[in-house]
Amino acid sequence: MFAPLNTKTEYSFLDSVVKVDDYLETAHRLGYQTVGICDVGNLHAAFRFVRKAQKFNLQPIISIELNFEWRGLPIAFSFIAKDTEGYKNLLRISTLHNYGRRQFSDIQNHLSGIALIIPETYGSLSELTELSSVADEAFIGIDQLTDKGAKFNLPTLPFPAIRYLNFADNEILAILHAVRDGVSFDESLTISSNELLQRPEAYETYFLKYFPQALKNLSALTAKIAYQFDEKLELPRFDKKRQAVEHLREEATLGLSARLEEKNLLTEVSSVNLQDLSVYQERLEKELSVIHQMGFDDYFLIVADLLRYAREQDIYCGMGRGSAAGSLVAYVLGITQVDPVQHNLFFERFLNPERVAMPDIDIDMPDDRRAELLAYMKNRYGSDHVAQIVTFSTLGKRQALRDVGKAFGMTEAELSNLTRMLVRRFGTLADEYENNQRFKAEVLKNGKLKRIYEVARRIEGMPRQTSTHASGVVLSEESLVNYVSLKPSEDLALTQYEAPDVEAIGLLKIDFLGLRNLTIISRLRDLVKRRQKIDIDPLKINLEDEDTLALFRAGNTMGIFQFENPQMRRFLRNLAPSKFDDIVDATSIFRPGPSQFIPQFVARRHGKEIVPTVDDSISEILKPTYGIMIYQEQIMQVAQAFAGFSLGKADLLRRAISKKKGSELEKLREDFLDSASHNGHSKEKAEEIYDLIERFANYGFNRSHGFAYGALAFQIAYFKAHFPDEFYEIQLRDRKREVMILDALENGFEIEKPSINLMKIGDFVKNKKIRLGLAHVQGISRDLAKWIVENQPYKDLADFVEKLPNNFHKKENILPLIQIGAFDYADSNRGKLAYNLADHANLLNYYSDDIFMASSGGGFAYHEAEDYSETEKYDFEKNLLGIGVTPHPLQNLARRFEGNFTPLAQLVKNRRMTILVEINYIRTHRTKTGQTMAFLTVSDSRENFDVTLFPEIYRQFSGELEQGKFYLISGKVTERNDELQLVTDRISPALETDRKLWLNLRDDKYNQKISQILREFPGSHQVILHYSNLKKTIQTKIYVEESEILQKRLEGYVIAGIYK
């Protein structure tokens, strides 16, 4: 029977549209019994293909196509693995090829268990016969286009290439080839249909008729192919001279003594201490027993050794994270810095003897020192025993559109116009087409664009090239090439299998996570030590520090890991955390799912809502979180306390619910109800508690992880509370600079005016004053910045230009410095300096080498010119520095309209409020009914914000809207996608004007009603009240728009009202 052995999958990058799952499903449906893959240049899909084929009861056959030079000829050989030995030789051959070994003689010793396929182009070469003696078998691969009268010097084998599964995909393949080759797609070219997977009968009929022996050869070959994969975990030995179980026990015992000494449990003997001591010792014994029983002794020694090396090199790796923080062994070995006994964290959540799985210890490290730890692993275990893991860059929606559009001849301008319409929140092109009306309208403009969209949608998500997994590293006892093909990479070799496959074949995977926040802590520590002569050990920071807790209570958490979101900051202000556990709760509940319980959580914390008692047996478990199961550990405790489950079994229940494992879940549910009954609970109560567990198990967060990451956030916040200068200087290097500068300003910092004599290369912060750095000035190269700092000071602009080397003697190198005010100390008229620079009086030419250098010596005579306006100065600074140093025009308006608007940072959901803002961007949108509405992006010089104008309001105010202008905008504050926005009903320009609204009243009888009406019409005109009976006039702080509707609303309450 025919078998498609030469199927190229999508991992033959841009050379096939065949997805592995689709291929197996189609082959099964068409009646195949045997299927193969033969990707070009790699084995990325091999292991996954074998496992999935077996689920379809299909016989899988693995092969690979590689170019090797044989007798001076570059030949695209295909290598079929006939058995397990052949599969391992495929791994070796592929690895050798990846490392540049491209001579056939380089692989001749690795052809056992291999069937060699030679392209029919070389089938008549007499020397081919010698290849049959090198490999187990050698064949000439033929297909339907092979000359039926051809004579070959080796046996033949049906080997047609398969690159698509549906006939319509042949065009997609042709376009993919155009993308791959960087050429335009030519529709006039005939598209071949012989690479379509057909029914087996079609191939059999053809080959029986023309090449019957080839079909027999295929049947004989496939009949003897089978693989046996040993998927048993093969952990590398940490120390081949010692038994790992003894070594681990010794290290853990010593580590426990050291940890207990830190807690004074060994030095201060008392009955309480002895009781605590026994808790630690018993738990350590229990954990060591489970670790050995599951075969992970070496694993713990390997990870502990790596963390020990990190400490020796002063690489701060944080507190540890994830469920590993629940292990006492991990704590005493220094893998984590969280005491699981003290904080009631569970080992079973990490390593469960009732659930056989690899322990998952993720190692966090500063991202700028990750390479050092990779190098240590390479040197410690050998370069052929350690590798990073491959991942794939796939065709995203933007790239897919660009690639296909280019193949169809679109210009760069057209491509940019099309891709600019894409919106990030819509994940795929199909989502864009469904939800982005502007994009859909563009696509439907003509048939060509519609076709480009359809093709791009089909190839979206396909792998385009390899990349390196952000964190995964694998280790093996034997050489890795016995398990997986490798390719060279920057730090370590790179596996050809992705992470799930690497773990499935029994390799140890450790995640080396480079965290920017650990880099920030390390840099903060270094800067504080250098400046303040204080060495802050992050692990010794008091997690109950009151100044730091006050920072969280105020929601002053910009720059703090996991606490920067505006909604999180608002939540913190409502929560008012008073202890570190509150911080852990906050980061754990503020997630999709459990965040729905935040209002109850806050209300119960402050006594505004009663905490329900579901059952006395679990009330103490839920008491710390006010009756809400935030944590997975609580779910396990409830199952243990209520139904008598072991913690291991409780963890199985939690996992079964969260992963929705049907049959397993049903059995565990019955076990829970039965066990609860044996514990004396009624069926009704047991079902109530089970339903409660089921509800929260979908949302529950790992408290071990929450504690470790809460501690990391607290450590960063400690520096913000106690060393704010150093905090902001480091954050300005590593974060969104504009955001952090604004945060510093809100915390009482000032920005120093730029001065060419005082600026450094980078930003500098001291005594709550920020000196912006030259490296951040747009248009100033690092080399120029370095020269400026090395040659300070300068008397004035002329002195600076005179000293400037010829290679920097350009207007574009100097004008930005004038425009940010770097020479204001000598002459504050920036307009005059810019005027004289080059365009008119040619200050640059005056100080060039060949002009005027022998002048009379009186110096350059400046021509007078008008200075920039304050708004122009602000705009130049904003564009060139990222922030305006000159007061923003809105600040003057804010003083004028104080009390008439609410700052963006203080908006409250579901309230009608007025904001004073600048319009940055106006986007119109046509509704399904054909009406036009608008979305505005506005800012108050500190924060950006979204404003929505529905059609009726847009019609009313569209003529007044202009980007770059200032407005008072009123409406209802709502929430969308977890972000606040304003749905407006009134817009009024914010103007500096002397025109006022004068209201004449008899007395103050209607003051409250008048004030209420006036505040519905915010605008630029100050309200003046004259009381005729009281003979007094009051200048109010209320400003209103000029409006006939307002005047009509005031009728009956005032004698007269006039604008003048």
Curated annotation (Swiss-Prot):
State its Enzyme Commission number(s): 2.7.7.7
**What GO MF terms are annotated?**
3'-5' exonuclease activity; DNA-directed DNA polymerase activity; nucleic acid binding
Top-rank taxon: Bacteria
Q: Name one GO biological process term.
A: DNA replication
- Entry's localization field: Cytoplasm
User: What keywords would UniProt list here?
Assistant: Cytoplasm, DNA replication, DNA-directed DNA polymerase, Nucleotidyltransferase, Transferase
Q: What does this protein do?
A: DNA polymerase III is a complex, multichain enzyme responsible for most of the replicative synthesis in bacteria. This DNA polymerase also exhibits 3' to 5' exonuclease activity. The alpha chain is the DNA polymerase.
Q: Can you name this protein? A: DNA polymerase III subunit alpha
